[in-house]
């Protein structure tokens, strides 16, 4: 897949295409197909649940962004997090949203156009091989569960920024939430590589792997849990 350059405030942020590997192409195709099909519904759901459990605000707070910073969101989807990220960096900062799914990006671009944001850009690219060279902060919400190599992916994100915040579902401890998550993963078995075996155990393993990557690459990692413990936010910080 070829990544597209992102334009912000008259300048260009260099983006590079990921290595061409059959496994990566197959995974990317599954993600594009699944999320592209449900883009409109996902857009509504993401905005309707923006404030549930304080997850979104907690993620942004954990990034510790300052006015003028550059923040990249991998798996930005229809742009539900863009408003709070832009507010955090101010008009002098930059927000870059990266997603692999065209219909999602079209909805995000519509949001940016309606708001008239000149310092928010969007790039189509694969988050597993980050198409952005550097930033002050990186955010990814409910993304790493899609990656069989979540440890390596998050490690590459840590190469791009000194602050990396990852939010994931934690399929343990709450029966109703686990049942809903199990059902969603089963319906989208190809998306989660979950055609066989214990899908909840697989999701838990990928959440653990993303946290382990932060532990290995960052100086400190803070973990908080939300919504009856079903959502985990891990914030990695590299001391300057």
Spans of model-derived segments:
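A short SAM/SAH-binding and catalytic strip from SAM-dependent methyltransferases
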Residues: 137-150
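C-terminal alpha-helical "lid/dimerization" subdomain adjacent to the S-adenosyl-L-methionine
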Residues: 26-29, 48-49, 167-225
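Helix-to-beta-strand junctions that scaffold the AdoMet/dcAdoMet cofactor pocket
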Residues: 90, 147-148, 161
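Core SAM-dependent methyltransferase catalytic element
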Residues: 219-240
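Conserved class I S-adenosyl-L-methionine
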Residues: 5, 9-64, 80-84, 107, ...
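A short glycine-rich, Lys/Arg-flanked "PGG" loop and its adjoining helix->strand segment in the class I
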Residues: 152-163
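Class I SAM-dependent methyltransferase SAM/SAH-binding core
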Residues: 72-129
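A short acidic, Gly/Pro-enriched loop at the edge of an enzyme's catalytic core
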Residues: 128-137
């Amino acid at each position: 897949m070829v990544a597209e350059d992102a334009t912000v405030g008259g300048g260009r942020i260099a983006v590079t295409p990921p290595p061409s590997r059959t496994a990566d192409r197959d995974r990317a195709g599954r993600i594009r197909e699944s999320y592209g099909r449900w883009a409109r519904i996902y857009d509504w759901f993401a905005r309707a649940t923006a404030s549930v459990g304080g997850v979104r605000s907690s993620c942004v707070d954990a990034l510790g962004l300052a006015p003028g910073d550059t923040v990249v969101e991998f798996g930005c989807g229809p742009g539900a997090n863009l408003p709070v990220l832009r507010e955090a960096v101010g008009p002098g900062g930059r927000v870059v949203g990266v997603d692999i799914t065209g219909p999602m990006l079209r909805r995000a671009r519509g949001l940016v156009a309606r708001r008239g944001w000149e310092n928010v850009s969007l790039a189509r690219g694969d988050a597993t091989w980050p198409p952005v060279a550097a930033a002050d902060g990186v955010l990814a919400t409910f993304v790493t569960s899609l990656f069989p190599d979540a440890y390596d992916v998050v490690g590459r994100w840590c190469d791009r920024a000194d602050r990396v915040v990852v939010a994931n579902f934690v399929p343990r401890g709450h029966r109703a939430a686990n049942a809903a998550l199990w059902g969603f993963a089963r319906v989208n078995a190809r998306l989660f590589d979950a055609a066989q075996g214990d899908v909840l155990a697989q999701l838990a393993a990928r959440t653990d792997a993303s946290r382990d990557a932060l532990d290995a690459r960052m100086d400190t990692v803070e973990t908080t849990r939300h919504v009856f413990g079903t959502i985990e936010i891990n914030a990695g910080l590299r001391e300057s």
